[in-house]
């Protein structure tokens, strides 16, 4: 898989002093850090952040960057699930974001009038796999800043407690035995039956369905059945993402697989189905951190949330990942869902001075010692640039788990094909149908038809 190769290169690459050239454009030959430091200016740049869970980290980064360079970085963060809406509002203002994020080719089509060509920047030069960038013609308009992974996060201490139960109804002795949906379901349902003895309120954290908080299902979980559908369409070693981008309609042929795991989540949860419409991602991560449940679906970015919960009882060494099994044929060899969805873009409509200052900032973040320490430490990114050597890997347990899964032999990583989803409205419609289903006001056939109709109508616009 490409991402395995990417990580292997990223982690094996050794920094050489001469590898660090200028900040910003190729024509700038000064050292990246000193360039910014020597360009003290009152220019203010504006970064519109996508990820609420790391908003405080970006604030600290901005403070350090201003102290080092004199350049003020305004950081604003969109509320969960509202990035497109917030960007539309902010981009129209006089002091618009100078740095923003697009979610792949579909996002570029929405914002191409505001995306500066970045092909001549040093950061693009440092990108290990140029094919990961968002391009159009000869231009480069979005640079990925992190390779991320998601799956089912589990508390290994609770799992080991279950395996040691004398009265457990399964013959499963270790996590290695759980390699498909049937085994997962068997274990989860038995754990739920023994939840008092295990000291948990439910096996899974709450399936957050509050407005703006359903992205784990409408996007990340939906990625799995649609990845396999697009893979079928592409045939053999074809490009599943491109097949998704080309699809004007979807069959949703593996909808029952989605239903398998979604039902497992909601039937064996800390929360009753009737209250899920009020549950947030923060609620779910707090439940996991406090030991109220054994499992939660999320990605390596969730470490900052888990670690930041007051009263956190989960030890770092017990935080592990397993794949999201749904009942697909051959899923015994399935790995985590690994990819990138967030790309940095520079606003082409702001002044050249602000464009260059913005380029300088993102280059500093991924090439300077201070910036890289934030990237691998506080942000926990697995950065796809050759500026990170083997000693600069993320140290948090979830990023380590992603790296471990990427290095496994004979494991199929599930590619992030949700970049092909036609719009945020499609995702919101999907989430709305799921909420009606889980609340019992609609059946599963309604969900399937709604998803198919929404894809078709959104692609037609």
Which residues make up each language-model segment?
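Conserved N-terminal structural module of periplasmic/extracytoplasmic solute-binding proteins
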Residues: 6-11, 18, 23-107, 120-124, ...
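A local structural motif
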Residues: 68-77, 95, 168-175, 249, ...
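Extracytoplasmic/periplasmic substrate-recognition and gating elements
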Residues: 72-73, 93, 310-380
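Short helix-initiation/N-cap motifs at beta->coil->alpha
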Residues: 77-86, 179-183, 275-290
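Hinge/lid segment of periplasmic solute-binding proteins
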Residues: 103-160, 316-325, 395
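Extracytoplasmic/periplasmic solute-binding protein
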Residues: 139-145, 182-246
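Glycine-centered hinge/linker elements that transmit conformational signals in sensory
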Residues: 186-189, 232-278
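C-terminal capping/gating helix-and-loop segments adjacent to ligand/active sites or protein-protein/ligand interfaces
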Residues: 338, 380-388, 400-456
